[in-house]
Amino acid sequence: MAVQLFFTEEQRKVFKSSFKSIDADGDGKITPEELKAAFKSIEIELTQEKIDEMMSMVDKDGSRPVDFSEILMKKAEQMRGKGAQYFKAFDALDTDKSGSLSPEELRTALSACTDPPMTKEEIDAIIKKADGNNDGEIRRAEFVRMIQSSY
């Protein structure tokens, strides 16, 4: 499924685990009753109207039980919406408009928003973790993956 390529393996595992915890009968689908029971198990009582509203937000094909692919599609929609915000943040940090964040740009940004300021070693560790192509800078896609993986 193409939407699965949008997520990291770790994200898919988390989503699948959450899905399975709600899918009480293990049939690969979440019914309104299972969703209501899941909320009740954490002491949240929802009206049938609210459950129906939540199901409709995810159930794109109108089949009513929601399968895992529909959950992934909804999550991808949510993340795409956040993507525009991530791009704006990246553009604000990319002060030289090079299309990548240099260690200096990242250091300046992180020093301004952390107290006490992050050390060079801490910033270098962030760059190393996020820098997928090992060029010493963080490109836009790497930045987005870094932000998404922190959730």
UniProtKB/Swiss-Prot annotation:
Tissues expressing the protein: Found in cell lineages giving rise to the aboral ectoderm, a squamous epithelium covering the surface of the late stage embryo and larva.
MF GO annotations: calcium ion binding
Gene responsible for this protein: SPEC2C
Binding site for Ca(2+) 4: 131, 135, 137, 142
Annotated binding of Ca(2+) 3, by residue: 94, 96, 98, 100, 105
Pfam assignment, any one: EF-hand_7
Protein name per the record: Calcium-binding protein SPEC 2C
Protein's organism: Strongylocentrotus purpuratus (Purple sea urchin)
EF-hand domain ranges (all copies): 10-45, 46-78, 81-116, 118-151
CDD domains: EFh (cd00051)
